[in-house]
Structures are given as C-alpha cells and as structure tokens.
Amino acid sequence: MIQTSIKQVVENIKVIAQTLFPEIAFVDFAKYHDKGLEKEGVRLVYSLSDSMSFNMHTDLFSLNFEMLDLLETLQDPDERILEVTSDTRDISSSFVDYLKKNGYYFQDSVSVTKVDKKYKDGLGGVAFTLDFNLAKTCLV
C-alpha cells in the first residue's frame, strides 16, 4: 500500500497505533516528547526527519520514532530500565512488522537505539527511523 503524501502516512500511523496496539497509551506526531504525561503506559512519539529524496518513480521520506515509558518509579532503577527497554523494544518490533506486512515500510532491517533517561520527566525506551516511499502523482 504505497502512500501519496506525508500527511497521509502520518495520520495512518496514528490510527494504526491507537487501534491495533492497545499497549501504546499515547500517540503523537510532535517534536517535543513530554506531552501527554498524564497518561500511564507506553507512548509513541514520532516526527519528520531531516532527510527526504526525490527518485524516478517514488519519493522517499523518513520519520523518527521514539517508543517511551517512565523510568522513574518505585522499582529498582536498574530493573526498571531493563523492563522499559525490553517492553518498548518488543512493542516497536511488532509495530514495524505490522507496517512492513501492510506495505507502509519496505526495508529488511531497522537500527534501534536505546533512549536513556534524557527527558526531564524520566522517559526512556527505544528510538528508530523508518523510510517511507511516496507514489508520484502522474501529471500529463
């Protein structure tokens, strides 16, 4: 299912995450990741990356994703970091698999990086970037 606009991809990703992944409590297309902190559970925040390219039949653009959860709890800090990293990696893997199986995403592997406690609210998890193809509209 090749898309024709960036806006279409962004909106579809939000719908997919909200309807098919109940473990994701908050989804937002935003630059700042500390929105929706009143929600408990895993959050998916994504934004447009700086890279795009024009090709012969399709164009390419990238979205940066962060799958995050709170690290600051009453649990042992090391155990919580391990739990959050494991959970967010598992959810991200399923999410990327769904996008690939349904034609949104086309590459065979995705590099995933660990997000340490980098936000003031103690959010951590995993981050990854996906490239998407856009069909060119045919102008005659």
Which sequence ranges carry the predicted segments?
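Small/polar-rich, solvent-exposed N-terminal microdomains that initiate assembly or binding
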Residues: M1-N55, Q107
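Charge-dense, low-complexity intrinsically disordered segments
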Residues: Q3-K7, L82, S86, K120
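Short, charged/polar surface micro-motifs in flexible loops or helix N-caps
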Residues: D50-M52, L70-T73
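Catalytic micro-motifs at enzyme active sites that drive phosphoryl/nucleotidyl and oxygen chemistry
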Residues: S51-F54, S111-D121
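Oligomerization/assembly interface segments of phage tail-like spikes and tubes
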Residues: H57-E72, G124-K136
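Short acidic, glycine/proline-rich loop/turn micro-motifs
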Residues: Q75-E79
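Short, hydrophobic/π-rich interface segment
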Residues: L82-F106
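A helicase ATPase "motif cassette" and its flanking acidic/Ser/Thr-rich regulatory loops
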Residues: L139
